[in-house]
Amino acid sequence: LKLTTSPVAVKLIPKGGEIPEGITRVDEAMRHCQLVDRVRRTGEEFYTLVEDQMCKGGAGAMGLGEMPPKVASGEFYFKGLKQFSTQGAARRTLEMVPKLPANSTEAIMYSPLEKASFTPDVVVVICTPRQVMLLTQAMMYKTGGRIESSFAGKQSLCSDGVVKVYKEGKIGVTVGCSGSRTYTKIADEEMIIGIPIELLADVASGLKEICPK
């Protein structure tokens, strides 16, 4: 596949669950998209609590705390970011964003896939469109079919890349959002693909067959 950065293993620890011994807490508050981008580049492994997540909209979507009222109502995207013609249009879009129940997640763990000390729920890969194509073809190698993608350019790495994949058990492809493309080093020519852990072995074996030798 010739990735230039690591696939990122992400695990959602349910409320009341225990954080494994030996994994350290992140050393500064950041957005989920920033955390994924940091891990893919630095090779660090850590966990985060709700207070470590700067973007409360992304954290709320992943069940870490609650969705901020101004985000859920559409006010933030309508009046703040001015990305919709009406607040109703913003609200409808946010209602459709994949999310977990509020306060259902205790912590979130991050690690480069190749050195993860835990079994992830989702593997997030940030790569070029061609590499997304190869990952898609690898997934299709065994049984065929199609990848169905759904996104709105909102809450991309959190909702589309993790929550949707976690809930549905299907691969998700997304294009990033204003936040993730502002606060990270994700390049204009990169996309995001989320792979549920249950399908990772099929993707890996398919890659061995279809990737150019």
Per-region residue spans from a language model:
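Acidic, serine/proline-rich low-complexity intrinsically disordered regions
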Residues: K2-K213
